[in-house]
Design a protein with these regions (language model features):
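Catalytic core of pol beta-like nucleotidyltransferases
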Residues: 1-25, 34-39, 50-100
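Short, well-ordered beta-strand segments
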Residues: 27, 44-46
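Glycine-rich beta-strand-to-loop/alpha-helix junction loops that act as flexible
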Residues: 29-31
Length: 100
């Protein structure tokens, strides 16, 4: 699967997410963003929401459920804006691809 096809899938996934969350950004990161995927690579996606609907442990199952409507290889990671202390989201912002 090429990068354009992956991005098109993620645009559709973002639209689904926007029906349930106040989405600020969605990023493709990992092997597809770095243009070195293998045949068995998953699709790493960072989802940044302005505010969680409930709490992380209630919202995370929903993003996983929604991905099944698009592609089971999507591996979403949920972030609440301004709450990531690890620096992981900043690295994704710098190296990932914004999904518009």
């Amino acid at each position: 699967m090429d990068k354009t096809e992956i991005i098109n899938k993620l645009v559709a996934y973002k639209k689904l997410l926007e029906q349930h969350f106040d989405v600020e950004d969605v990023f493709l990161f990992g092997s597809y963003a770095n243009e070195n995927p293998r045949e068995d690579s998953d699709i790493d996606v960072a989802i940044v929401v302005k505010k969680l609907n409930d709490d992380y442990f209630k919202d995370t199952p929903l993003i996983w459920k929604l991905r099944k409507q698009i592609d089971d290889r999507i591996e979403p990671v949920l972030f609440e804006k301004g709450k990531d202390q690890s620096g992981f989201l900043e690295e994704i912002r710098n190296k990932g691809i914004v999904i518009k």
